UniProtKB/Swiss-Prot annotation:
Family (UniProt): Belongs to the neurotoxin 09 (Tx3-6) family.
Protein name: U11-ctenitoxin-Pn1a
Keyword hit for Signal: yes
Protein purpose: Probable neurotoxin.
Recorded GO MF terms: toxin activity
Comment text on domains: The presence of a 'disulfide through disulfide knot' structurally defines this protein as a knottin.
Cysteines engaged in disulfide bonds, as pairs: C37-C51, C44-C57, C50-C75, C59-C73, C83-C90
Cell compartments where the protein resides: Secreted
Amino acid sequence: MKCAVLFLSVIALVHIFVVEAEEEPDSDALVPQERACLARGETCKDDCECCDCDNQCYCPFDWFGGKWHPVGCSCAHANQYFCDHKKEKCKKA
């Protein structure tokens, strides 16, 4: 009798793992969705990627004319002059 209970317990345990494995989605199936714009503090490559008019893509160590950024760039606060410049630069075509 004990053997039958043990056997059924093992069958139930195997069934639980099989069902859980079927319910998990593949990591390849999960596609990251791109945001329309980046919030302040997030990593960026261009001013047009940053949300709002008063945010710019700021690179603290902008060496070699913008071709190499050892620390990286992030969206940061800008002034009103930059806001006007960004409107012209980032017009939607």
